[in-house]
Amino acid sequence: MLVTGFGRVAEFTAQALKNAGCDVYVTARNKLKLIRAECMGYKIIDFEKKSSFLYLFDYIFNTVPENIFTEEDVGHIKGKYFELASAPYGADKEYFIGRENDYIDGKALPGRYFSRSAAEKLAEITLKHINYGNGGD
């Protein structure tokens, strides 16, 4: 699992995924937030090298409300992409044409629930997908 950014929503999302037993990585442009994530026990990845690691993750949770992924970057994403950020979003949904099932629109989730509840709900949905959506593998 990869969480992009490490603000309030990202922090709760990472914690909920970790509490659910997931192996969580964090990437962010802000070096202080990366240090904080590492101190909290998450594995960190240098955001500037994103094209070399995006393909490694089955699930990417974007919380950065800014276009941080180019069309080329999205081409490297092999798993599911959860958009949790507000406009202008981390990636243009158009980049997922032909791969619509890989783009999960969760933008309303953090606003619909408090951050912790939203993160817990997201972890629950993700685990259901892993356990049941993929034949239990």
Locate each region found by the language model.
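Glycine-rich adenosine-cofactor-binding loop
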Residues: M1-L17
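Residues in the short beta-alpha loop(s) of Rossmann-like NAD(P)-binding domains
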Residues: G7, R29-K31, A87
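Conserved S-adenosyl-L-methionine
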Residues: A16-V24, K78, N101
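NAD(P)-binding Rossmann-fold cofactor-contacting core
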Residues: N19-M40
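Rossmann-like NAD(P)-binding element
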Residues: K49-F69
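Rossmann-fold NAD(P) dinucleotide-binding segment
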Residues: E66-Y81
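Adenosine-phosphate binding glycine-rich loop
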Residues: A87-D137
